[in-house]
Amino acid sequence: MSTQTEPKLVTQIDFARAGQITPQMKEVAEREHRDPEYIRERVADGRIAIPANIVHIKKGMRAFGVGEGLSTKVNVNLGISGDKADAAEEWKKVKIAEDFGADAIMDLSNSGKTRQFRQQLIDETPLMVGTVPMYDAIGYMEKPLVKLTKEDLFEVVRAHAEDGVDFMTIHCGINKSVTKSFKETGRLMNIVSRGGSLLFGWMEVTGNENPFYEYFDELLEICHEYDVTISLGDSCRPGCLYDSNDATETAEMIELGKLCKRAWAAGVQVMVEGPGHMALDEIAANMKLQKRLCHNAPFYVLGPLVTDIGVGYDHITAAIGGAISASSGADFLCYVTPAEHLCLPNAQDVLDGLMATKIAAHAADIAKKVPHARDMDDKMGQARRKLDWDAIWKCALDPVTGKKRYEESPAATEGTCTMCGKMCAVRTVNKVFEGTTIDLGMED
């Protein structure tokens, strides 16, 4: 008889490879109108991730699948900023994210002791929760950047895992080889990733390799213990159109592809992050390249923004790029608000950014033929044909805003709106088919 013990199954990918369908896989399958085996197969080979920390599962989180054949997920960024620290305002943003259909919240708090806010968020929200431990490191350890050690950084990662964070953006791909490429080839906007810039600065001052790259296996051990999904951060994403698809971005993407395989081998789930700023005609090719280089891992993108001059309207520039990126293979969109490049977003900015991104994600899902993606659109068509406003609100992504605008401008003719009144085309054709009088209010 063999004395070897079976390896302990901890992560979703562990269970999937053992042929077991977890409750989270079943939940994802039901929500996505897929067979549970469809989900299990793709979790097993890394094409789908279910970011669900074992700690957060015990607190009642909902399971969300990210990846091939699933609906495009949407993330909301928030968190306490040093220049405008207001926890109450951030909780308003959490409520908006939950009420208006976000799938994930990333706590990007970077001021002081952030653990209380993070722990409360994980305790209270059923959505996926992500963080960037590098943002937290300086406040957590109470040290200047260049004094941080590898042990310090990994202590912060472990603290986030213990708290129940479902996915962490960790900039593992920016190693000495990538920074050499960056310094040799140059860029218009240099490095615009906050976490990536901090690591680049640390590497340049200390002369050391990126500890998240050098000690990647140790990082994987922490993530495996809690089933934290690694979201491989793209330190070298383009910060302007000029830098898109350059040698530095591609060099890092190649490194991220290698790290995907190492993570999967260790039983750790992976997502890969992407651009950024990118011209409209380059997006589809970039998505396909990423999927190839990173072995079809779920792709998590920030837009991309399709122009650099939409200041104050970057939720629109990002939604345009997001619709194209998601319809071309991206699986997860990070929202962008009107405040992008300007200031910390307020609650209204969060709502505007979330809705713009949800529209982009939904449009992409229709194009990708995601099961039942168009159902609500068809119901909306039926409701509008009947001029059934109550049904219209039930179909709308944001019924609150739609109903508010409609009621602020009451029409004189029942069933119509003030744009057309009695000249409403839908009303006119309905009357034709009903055989009733077409009264336009202009008759003698």
Where are these predicted regions, by residue range?
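Catalytic or ion-coupling anion/metal-binding cores of large enzyme and transporter domains
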Residues: 180-204, 238, 242-244, 344-444
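C-terminal catalytic subdomain
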Residues: 309-318, 324-370
